[in-house]
């Protein structure tokens, strides 16, 4: 059963009416209701608040990494383990083909259903997950394969065991190594881009965000609790943090925004998957045509956080 957010109640009501019209076999009513539905969707989704966009980024029906991998990656083979400690199910790694282009795909997977969510640790990777991702990146470099990374995590796992096994070192190592990979790298934030847990697989030649995704240094609730000592100030925190694709594109922190289907990726995962596939192929062609893409990647990364201080 589809899940509707509070601001989608009118959409739910019209959708229910359409289903009743189908049961009655009333094609005329169905056609009228579908036009009304399209109008309502455009009205709601063209006036979303930043808080509502956060809700969409976390929507339980939103496609996860495995959904996209199943839809766009052919002849795929999953690779497990980090060769050091364990296999982290929160990060998935595949070799396969996207439109006959051999690729390596690395994704953060939250899981569906109680058992699978627990297996995936709710998409919060441990150090072995990031080392597993780095192992696959080095594999891609060895065999000259482009890399597609799908980012979707609330953050790296903050447990004691993760810290004891070097969580911060694993993330820092990925930042260093991914910055110097000699193959094209493309990263797409498909849902939540939470802090260093997201950044560990977001250092790339092209960094894009889905239209209703977020990218932040801390959760808005955490920010509200720390700065305002009040978790209910989440909406205030969201505006201050500027975590939406539009804000981050204006700040020069991401390269592109991938538009979603009119009702959001959670209502049409097939169209959403196709747009990611087309973006990847277009971005890959652009990178491959640039003989200086490694230098350009380095310059882009070095420019982040730079500022000019004037003396009065």
Swiss-Prot record:
Its EC number is 2.1.3.15. Pathway: Lipid metabolism; malonyl-CoA biosynthesis; malonyl-CoA from acetyl-CoA: step 1/1. Belongs to the AccA family. The gene is accA. Keywords: ATP-binding, Cytoplasm, Fatty acid biosynthesis, Fatty acid metabolism, Lipid biosynthesis, Lipid metabolism, Nucleotide-binding, Transferase. One of its GO terms (cellular component) is acetyl-CoA carboxylase complex. This is Acetyl-coenzyme A carboxylase carboxyl transferase subunit alpha. It comes from Helicobacter pylori (strain ATCC 700392 / 26695). Residues 36-286 form the CoA carboxyltransferase C-terminal domain.
């Amino acid at each position: 059963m589809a899940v509707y957010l509070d601001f989608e109640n009118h959409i739910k009501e019209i959708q229910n009416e359409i289903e009743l019209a189908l049961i009655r076999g009333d094609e005329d009513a169905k056609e009228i209701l579908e036009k009304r539905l399209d109008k309502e969707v455009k009205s709601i989704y063209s006036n979303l608040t930043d808080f509502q966009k956060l809700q969409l980024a976390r929507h339980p029906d939103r496609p996860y990494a495995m959904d996209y991998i199943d839809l766009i990656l052919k002849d795929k083979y999953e690779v497990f383990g980090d060769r050091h400690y364990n296999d982290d199910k929160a990060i998935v790694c595949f070799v396969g083909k996207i439109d006959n282009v051999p690729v390596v795909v690395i994704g953060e997977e939250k899981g569906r259903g109680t058992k699978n969510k627990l297996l995936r640790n709710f998409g919060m990777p441990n150090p072995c997950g990031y080392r597993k991702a780095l192992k696959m990146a080095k594999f891609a470099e060895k065999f000259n394969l482009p890399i597609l990374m799908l980012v979707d995590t609330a953050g790296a796992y903050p447990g004691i065991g993760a810290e004891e096994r070097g969580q911060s070192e694993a993330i820092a190592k990925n930042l260093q190594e991914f910055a110097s990979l000699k193959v094209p790298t493309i990263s797409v934030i498909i849902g939540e881009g939470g802090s260093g847990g997201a950044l560990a697989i977001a250092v790339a030649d092209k960094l894009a965000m889905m239209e209703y995704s977020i990218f932040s240094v801390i959760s808005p609730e955490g920010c509200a609790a720390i700065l305002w000592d009040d978790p209910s100030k989440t909406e205030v925190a969201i505006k201050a943090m500027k975590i939406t694709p539009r804000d981050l594109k204006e700040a020069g922190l991401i390269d592109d925004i991938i538009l979603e289907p009119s009702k959001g990726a959670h209502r049409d995962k097939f169209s959403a998957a196709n747009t990611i596939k087309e973006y990847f192929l277009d971005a890959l062609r652009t990178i491959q045509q640039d003989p200086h893409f490694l230098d350009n990647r380095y310059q882009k990364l070095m420019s982040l956080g730079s500022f000019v201080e004037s003396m009065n």
